[in-house]
A protein has these predicted regions:
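Short, basic and Ser/Thr-rich N-terminal targeting/leader segments
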Residues: 8, 42-44, 209
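Glycine-rich phosphate-binding loop of actin/hexokinase-like ATP-binding domains
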Residues: 20-115, 121, 130, 134, ...
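Active-site neighborhood for divalent-cation/phosphate handling
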Residues: 1-27
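ATP-binding/phosphotransfer module of carbohydrate and carboxylate kinases, centering on a glycine-rich
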Residues: 2, 27-28, 88-267
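Short coil/turn segments at beta-strand junctions that form active-site/ligand-binding loops
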Residues: 10, 34-36, 209-211
Length: 267
């Protein structure tokens, strides 16, 4: 900044978007009594932030004796132990960072198109589509998350995947089921992600005081299938199996507000 002529001394605070999402969500509900807070990004990428008791963070040394909490940026998109199949590995090899951010590649919007295309091409090779539909699918050079949703909302409309099916009813249904299966897996993995983080908070056992999960990202809010599927797995897995309760909220401009609060608190 000095090289650009800004001589005034400035205090700079660098904050991750999952962290600002948590802060922004907390600020959006001052009248609610939540047990704890989580910031979750499910858009082009994915990440998680939660509140950890300082006494449990041993690397803080003597500072760990201070009673309080610290926001933890998990970088959950880099998780590498989720079960993967051959098609996951094959798609991963085509990305700019093979072997990196494997969890993100299985659930986030930036990789959704490539993953779906990989599955559809393999399905065509195995004869799940009619010959002409299979040829059109094989000719697809790329596929975006928007094009996937265009098909899900309008399977007989003017969009790339509907064109591939050429009006063949059975092919339309097969294509829909394959996409639905991948979205189902993504929603299940997000639920597992939350199921791993919530016990770390030690909170959320009381449904009257759930953990507040501020969700941010286009995959959660714009995908036709993902939001409802996550709600279903939250109920069946987190609530009924684990006895954990959370509430998903949408905050207005959580990153902007969270960054402003972080800046003010660290000025």
């Amino acid at each position: 900044m000095k090289a650009r002529g800004h001589q005034e001394k400035k205090s700079i605070v660098l904050v991750n978007d999952a962290v600002t999402t948590l802060i922004g969500g907390k600020a959006a509900c001052p009248d609610r009594q939540f047990d704890s807070y989580i910031g979750f990004i499910w858009g082009t990428g994915t990440n998680t932030c939660y509140m950890e008791q300082t006494r449990r963070i041993t690397k803080l040394g003597s500072a760990a004796d201070i009673d309080g909490t610290m926001l933890i940026n998990v970088e959950s998109g880099g998780y590498a132990k989720a079960p993967r199949g051959d098609l996951d590995a094959g798609f991963d090899a085509t990305t700019v960072n093979p072997g990196g951010y494997m969890f993100e590649k299985m659930i986030s919007g930036a990789y959704q198109g490539g993953m779906v295309r990989t599955v559809l091409v393999q399905a065509a090779k195995e004869g799940l589509f009619t010959a002409e539909t299979g040829k059109r699918i094989a000719a697809l050079e790329s596929l975006s998350s928007k094009e996937i949703d265009d098909f899900l909302f309008r399977p007989y409309g003017e969009n790339a995947l509907a064109h591939c099916c050429g009006g063949v009813e059975e092919d339309c249904q097969t294509l829909y089921y394959l996409i639905d299966g991948l979205m189902e897996r993504a929603a299940r993995f997000v639920a597992f992600n939350l199921a791993a983080v919530m016990p770390k908070t030690g909170k959320g056992a009381n449904p009257c005081r759930p953990v507040c999960v501020t969700m941010d990202g286009s995959t959660y809010y714009k995908s036709k299938l993902c939001k409802d599927k996550l709600s279903a797995y939250t109920k069946s897995f987190l609530n009924e199996e684990l006895g954990l309760y959370c509430e998903f909220i949408k905050a207005e401009n959580p990153n902007l507000i969270g960054a402003a609060i972080a800046g003010l608190l660290n000025a």
